[in-house]
Amino acid sequence: MKSASVASLFLAALTMFAISPASAEIIGEDAAACAGGHGPAIQVNIVGLKDRTGEIWLELYPATESDFLRPDQDLVAEGKVFRRTRSRPPASGAVSICIRKPHAGRFTLMLRHNRVGKDKFSVFSDGAGVPSNKPLGRSKPKFDQAVIGVGPTVTVANIRVQYLRGLRGFAPLDS
């Protein structure tokens, strides 16, 4: 009886490991920064992709409302934090994307599923997500929805991608 319960616990633990985001393929130019948990980086586990077309973009901005979603060339010219990593999603399985961060502290994050391959966001086809996972509705993500506090090693966040869902605006596919 005791060996049966130990075997059940072992099987349950093995199953949890197999479906955990830790087993996801880590993508992006900065994937090595998340390997082994060394960092400094942010690993975003992506949930709710509509499909596996196009690219996943993850952008890191300063944690100031006036800088969130500002053009990258302006932020870089002013010497402010900005980083973008992008990658094609794997054909199947769980997906995580990694982005290097300059230091511990507060930042804002924006995830984009660029399904059509254009540099400009396509409202009718692209997906978007932020760390708070609150429905985006019919407006750009708000600053407070995108803020994330990060430590000196690898910080893990889960982001549910949202797509245009008719008149109510952007929301997860399963809502």
Each predicted region: which residue ranges?
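A short tyrosine-centered beta-strand micro-motif
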Residues: 95, 102-111
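Acidic, divalent-cation-chelating loop motifs in proteins
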Residues: 112-116
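Bacterial N-terminal signal peptides
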Residues: 8-18
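Positively charged n-region of N-terminal signal peptides that target proteins for export
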Residues: 1-5
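Short acidic/polar alpha-helix capping motifs at helix-coil junctions
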Residues: 59-61, 74-76, 110-111
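Tryptophan-paired
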Residues: 71-101
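Primarily secretory-pathway and cell-envelope proteins
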Residues: 20-69, 120-175
